[in-house]
């Protein structure tokens, strides 16, 4: 799962396998797999990624919440590093909307609990208005109320036309959230089912298989 998402994001080179296609508003399809993050941006794809490793890949633990917002807004210029007002406003909005427990927006991220770190990361990535949003275990470490808050945010992204790739382990949640569910076992795709009609036992059978199937996710 980790390698799959990193390959789509352009963070890992792929040796072989089917391509992930992005269809633009004008109907043109482009391969994302095999391209660097810079090449993906040039295609007009605003890709946001909430990795499983929150502090290793997602946020910088020694930096405060505001500075972590600035990292996401940096597009190749220096303005983001000189102007803190917009990142500060975003940090405070995320703290308020996602009920992040922190002394202030200037608190180093490493001092937050795991659940609050996750809220900051998810909030930052969603705030960038992505066309493709990839999330790996976005509610791990969160309480029930916070989890449903994140699920609601993801559903709103879908309503806005964002393509959401959700990696999770709770079958009830996957069936509730996903339009299509791709099952993998030992690094191989074993099946793709309709999330609206899929049953847990059907998915369970696919989880025990180890055979490739053809199809696009």
Named regions from a protein language model:
Residues 1-217:
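Glycine-rich phosphate-binding loops of nucleotide-dependent enzymes
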